[in-house]
């Protein structure tokens, strides 16, 4: 398998083949956010800019107990709740991805259960607490994984990142973030 850092190296080379020496802009969200940051860290001269839709959890802030602004305290509470209720998938995918992979690669219902639960939990909600993603939208998103047979590979990235990932350097590329 490959880590986000290794994926970044591959994508930079592919982009250089596609656009030559012309700098390009990248955008990433979720795991792609980490990949995009590694691309910017490894090859800043190749980029005009970086757009992120996810910056991850700011882990040091979770441990801070004093001098928090209202915004930081709110972030800390929401991030802590997320860690306590929504990160079990990370532990499974980072330690036993192959066990999971059989169920999500062999059964469309297994894949829908695994991914659909996350899409439902993480999507915005209306006033009634219903997901802003329709059931059809969720099925379409899951179908992309099913049709391309990439769910096992996507799960395995967490194991690779848990064992191979190096810390990111400070970024010098112009960066925009939309949350």
Where are these regions (language model features)?
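Conserved structured core elements
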Residues: 5-9, 25, 29, 33, ...
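Alpha/beta-hydrolase active-site loop
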Residues: 2-18
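Beta-sheet entry/capping signal
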Residues: 12-13, 22-26, 46-51, 102, ...
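Short, flexible, glycine/charge-rich loop motifs used to bind or transfer phosphoryl groups or to couple energy/partner
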Residues: 15-16, 40, 164-168
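Residue-level signal for well-ordered alpha-helical scaffold segments within enzymatic catalytic domains
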Residues: 13-17, 38, 114
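C-terminal subdomain of alpha/beta-hydrolase-fold enzymes, centered on the catalytic histidine
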Residues: 93-179
């Amino acid at each position: 398998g490959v880590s986000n850092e290794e994926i970044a190296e591959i994508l930079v080379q592919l982009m250089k083949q596609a656009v030559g020496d012309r700098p390009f802009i990248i955008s990433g969200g979720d795991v792609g956010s980490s990949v995009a940051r590694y691309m910017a860290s490894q090859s800043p001269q190749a980029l005009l800019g970086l757009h992120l839709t996810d910056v991850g959890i700011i882990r040091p802030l979770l441990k801070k107990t004093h001098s928090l602004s209202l915004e930081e305290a709110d972030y800390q509470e929401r991030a802590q709740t997320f860690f306590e209720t929504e990160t079990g998938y990370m532990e499974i995918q980072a330690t036993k991805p192959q066990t999971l992979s059989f169920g999500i690669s062999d059964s469309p219902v297994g894949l829908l259960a695994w991914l659909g639960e996350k899409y439902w939990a993480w999507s915005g909600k209306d006033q009634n607490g219903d997901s802003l993603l329709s059931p059809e939208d969720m099925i379409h998103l899951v179908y992309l994984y099913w049709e391309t047979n990439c769910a096992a590979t996507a799960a395995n990235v967490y194991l690779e990142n848990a064992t191979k990932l190096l810390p990111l350097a400070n970024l010098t590329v112009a960066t925009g973030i939309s949350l």
